[in-house]
């Protein structure tokens, strides 16, 4: 365990420096967060797998789908397509990714979309799926 700590310590220092620098860019207004016209819920670190995000997304869908028109937005990890894809009855895991396919199969009444560029995906949702009341990503 000591060897692992020794090996990971330099990585943690680099990550800390990166995070601090990025936070400074936000503080000085050089980069900005984006506000959308609809509520959004972002779950965890979108680039790290195996952290339980899908379970939380599924829980939130169950909790809100009776009262809100929900759209989920995912990058569609491991899918064979590119760009924005709106899940349909003919969609499969190759087209939209395994987790979005799981959400669509379990909750066909919600919109499930994938787009590797989250900002682009949200802009398309706002334009083409204007009945969306809550977006979970």
Model-derived regions: residue spans:
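Residue-level signal for inorganic ion chemistry
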Residues: 14, 54, 103
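A transmembrane-helix-recognition feature enriched in membrane-embedded lipid enzymes
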Residues: 1-39
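ATP-dependent carboxylate-amine ligase catalytic core
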Residues: 4-7, 11, 48, 65-137
